[in-house]
């Protein structure tokens, strides 16, 4: 029987789709690096009566009446975010990481200003200046990337480009970079050319909160993040900044980019921040990193090539060219074995972004199920059976491994 009792009565089609999605999440191994499974407490907050409340403005300065209780919720989220990351100011209203990034741009830049960000094709993000994104249309972005041989950011090259282009803002952070980011070096480069520094830590925020990745907060005027991914909160965004930028950042989000905040999601963010301050969260993040290292080793031992040779965080990029597979083909084949990944461009990829030569793999969601290093080696074996062999017998063996792991590590048990 479905848990969506009222929904089944009102809209059985949507309820049925939700039932199928829940079944997929329970019976598949989720390896998309940007996805995770929130706690039931976070889901309760996200599905609460707060979805009914309009609250344009900020706590104590609303354009609607009846905001005394949602003010309490937003203040909790703000104070917890500041405490969790040691920040001077936090804006928890962005609906997404993309909105958080645009909020920073509109707070500190004018249209046409020069910004230095990471090349999307080398692991950056659409909102770091891709020409198809609004960021690339409003501002003059120039790109840095990774070294062709090491797969790592060449900071000397970043400095050279910064000296040549004199950006007003440098953006550090990535959506597909498996190595530690040197925020001190980015700060030094920014200072040398008179630029501000923004760090998009969307992927690594949970690791930063747990002290397992250097924090960008002491180095950057602005830090943006999503609240899902490794942070294991609801889908949403957040901006941390120095106090001197607080008013401009807040004004850029509301009324600049958004109207009413999503108070039910802000409540869920507050819950996630509270969870992230517990000792169990640090242990969880340590397991994410240990699982990523174990999965990287398991794949390497089975003949897979990883961009940069491995990982320092929660994700890895697999270069499939030695397997004579495209990322698109690998994603489809793994999905048939109930392993969920996403096709992803590798640096200097000869394939189009719709095909790609690689896949991106991450461990946050599998770790949320309780999987450990031994389980990651079994996952590596299932991936190997599916992609290196691909015969019907091998695919059946891979599915059997997935079934056993999902039974051993149930979701929302």
Curated annotation (Swiss-Prot):
Record's GO cellular component terms: cytosol
Residues with PTM N6-(pyridoxal phosphate)lysine: 229
EC number: 2.1.2.1
Reaction(s) this enzyme catalyzes, per UniProt: (6R)-5,10-methylene-5,6,7,8-tetrahydrofolate + glycine + H2O = (6S)-5,6,7,8-tetrahydrofolate + L-serine
Binding site for (6S)-5,6,7,8-tetrahydrofolate: 120, 124-126, 352-354
Endoplasmic reticulum found in the keyword field: no
Keyword field contains Ribosomal protein: no
Cited Pfam families: SHMT (PF00464)
Organism superkingdom: Bacteria
Family: Belongs to the SHMT family.
Self-association state and partner proteins as the record states: Homodimer.
Identification of the protein by name: Serine hydroxymethyltransferase
Gene for this chain: glyA
């Amino acid at each position: 029987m479905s848990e969506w009792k009222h929904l089944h009565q009102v809209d059985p089609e949507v309820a049925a789709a939700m039932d199928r999605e829940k079944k997929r999440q329970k019976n598949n191994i989720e390896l998309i690096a940007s996805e995770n499974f929130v706690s039931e407490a976070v889901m309760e907050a996200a599905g609460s009566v707060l979805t009914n409340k309009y609250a344009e403005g900020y706590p104590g300065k609303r354009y609607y009446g009846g905001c005394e209780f949602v003010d309490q919720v937003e203040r909790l989220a703000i104070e917890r975010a500041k405490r969790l990351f040691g920040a001077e100011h936090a804006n928890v209203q962005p609906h997404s990481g993309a909105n958080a990034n645009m909020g920073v741009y509109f707070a500190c830049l004018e249209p046409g200003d020069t910004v230095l960000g990471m090349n999307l094709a080398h692991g950056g993000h659409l909102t770091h200046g891709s020409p198809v994104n609004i960021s690339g249309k409003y501002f003059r972005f120039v790109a840095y990337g990774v070294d062709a041989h090491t797969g790592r950011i060449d900071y000397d090259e970043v400095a050279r480009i910064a000296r040549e282009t004199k950006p007003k803002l440098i953006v550090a952070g990535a959506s597909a970079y498996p190595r530690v980011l040197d925020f001190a070096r980015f700060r030094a480069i920014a200072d040398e050319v008179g630029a501000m520094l923004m760090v998009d830590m969307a992927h690594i925020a949970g690791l930063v909160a747990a002290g397992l990745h250097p924090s960008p907060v002491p180095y950057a005027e602005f830090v943006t993040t999503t609240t899902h991914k490794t942070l294991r909160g609801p889908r949403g965004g957040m901006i941390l900044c120095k106090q001197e930028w607080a008013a401009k950042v807040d004004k850029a989000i509301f009324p600049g980019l958004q109207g009413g905040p999503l108070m039910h999601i802000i409540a869920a963010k507050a819950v996630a921040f509270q969870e992230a301050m517990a000792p169990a969260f640090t242990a969880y993040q340590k397991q994410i990193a240990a699982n990523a290292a174990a999965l990287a080793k398991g794949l390497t031992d089975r003949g897979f090539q990883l961009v940069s040779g491995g990982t320092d965080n929660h994700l890895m990029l697999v270069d499939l060219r030695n397997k004579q597979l495209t990322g698109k083909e690998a994603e489809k084949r793994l999905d048939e074995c109930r392993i969920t990944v996403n096709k992803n461009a590798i640096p200097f990829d000869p394939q189009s972004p719709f095909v790609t030569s690689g896949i991106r793999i991450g461990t946050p969601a599998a770790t949320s199920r309780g999987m450990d290093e031994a389980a990651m080696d079994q996952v590596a074996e299932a991936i190997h059976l599916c992609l290196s062999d691909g015969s019907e017998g091998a695919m059946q063996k891979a599915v059997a491994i997935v079934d056993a792991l999902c039974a051993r590590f149930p979701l929302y048990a």
